[in-house]
Amino acid sequence: MTNTLDVLKARASVKEYDTNAPISKEELTELLDLATKAPSAWNLQHWHFTVFHSDESKAELLPVAYNQKQIVESSAVVAILGDLKANENGEEVYAELASQGYITDEIKQTLLGQINGAYQSEQFARDSAFLNASLAAMQLMIAAKAKGYDTCAIGGFNKEQFQKQFDISERYVPVMLISIGKAVKPAHQSNRLPLSKVSTWL
């Protein structure tokens, strides 16, 4: 399945997975790499992935995710984390652009000043972490479908317990879990509200 529009139309949330359909570390790595191609504000790449690939790690995650069976039946689960200090990525991102001649050092310093100024607001940092990490999450799900895998975005888990259980730095905020695997049966397409109800033309 390589046509982008076909992939978008075919993607649906799957909660029942084939337990005999593993995903290799190489395949999973490729999907994560594709997810990192998602856009982000100032290209700060506000995401971090915690990958639950082994049966043992998924079993440990299970009670944190309220014992949802897809956690252990899927081939892997990826926790999408948002970076509350993504502004600290700015120097690395823009130093490379400056060294390649795409921006001047003056422009680099101006951009870093704007970024660090915005990050004085904790609310801005949190909103940006959720917004931009979610873009990577969606890209991961689309990439997985394009590669023949199914997914489900999971918001129902104990985020505080997750942070403690897996020793997640306070720099990161848990955004969602994404289960990945092969559907044991075709997912049914969920209904959508009419476009006229969810859009306004001006």
UniProtKB/Swiss-Prot annotation:
Q: Give one Pfam family, short name only.
A: Nitroreductase
Which amino acid positions bind FMN, per UniProt?
Answer: R11, A12, S13, Q68, K69, Q70, G155, G156, R192
Q: Where in the cell is it found?
A: Cytoplasm
Q: Which UniProt keywords apply?
A: Aromatic hydrocarbons catabolism, Cytoplasm, Detoxification, Flavoprotein, FMN, NAD, NADP, Oxidoreductase
Q: What is its main location?
A: cytoplasm
Per the record, the GO terms for biological process are: catabolic process; response to toxic substance
What switches on its expression?
Answer: Repressed by YodB. Strongly induced by stress due to exposure to catechol and less strongly induced after diamide or 2-methylhydroquinone (2-MHQ) stress. Not induced by oxidative stress due to hydrogen peroxide or methylglyoxal.
Q: Which Gene Ontology cellular-component terms appear in the entry?
A: cytoplasm
Q: Which cofactor does it need?
A: FMN
Q: Which GO terms describe its molecular function?
A: oxidoreductase activity
From what superkingdom does this record's organism come? Bacteria
EC assignment: the record states 1.-.-.-
Tell me the InterPro entries matching this sequence.
Nitroreductase, Nitroreductase-like
Q: What family does the Swiss-Prot or TrEMBL record give for this protein?
A: Belongs to the nitroreductase family.
Outline what the protein does: Putative nitroreductase that may contribute to the degradation of aromatic compounds.
Record-given protein name: Putative NAD(P)H nitroreductase YodC
What gene is behind this protein?
yodC
